[in-house]
Amino acid sequence: NYGCIGVVIGNEMTHGFDDQGRNFDKDGNMINWWTAEDAQKFETTARKLADQFSEIYVADGVRANGNMTLGENIADQGGLLISYLAFRNAAKGEVMEEIDGFTPDQRFFIGYARLWGQNIRPEEVLRLTQIDVHSLGELRVNQALRNIEAFYEAFNIQPTDKMYLEPEKRVVVW
């Protein structure tokens, strides 16, 4: 459940601190309440995440639009991290066993992957890439996970694995 509903809740919470939500204070007033240093760090990291998504081809000659999907990509990653931390905190001191050959951490990430699974036609991929502020389901899963160290540890991801992303290329906004 943490990998599914926990991620959705964390996603919505993170919108308060994404590229749009960060411009509003606790009362909903549009105001710059961040320090210049914090804003600069955020913008630099957010730009790296947008660029990372924009490098991905979703079809022949067509790339994802990391600028258009930035807020949702930040929220997806933030929701994933918030939920994972809550999951690990709830499990402290408990013996959690493998089920069907999967560790608790692996099941968390599998739950996350199932949340955004899609089976869509190529024409829909193109349409969504042009109009949707959400990344395609495959990117919401794979690209978010490729940036999260706990995913590498859970599945023992190695440099030769398809999901591997070099540590210096990984981007974590929050």
Language model segments and positions:
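Zinc-dependent metallohydrolase catalytic domains
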Residues: 1-6, 16-174
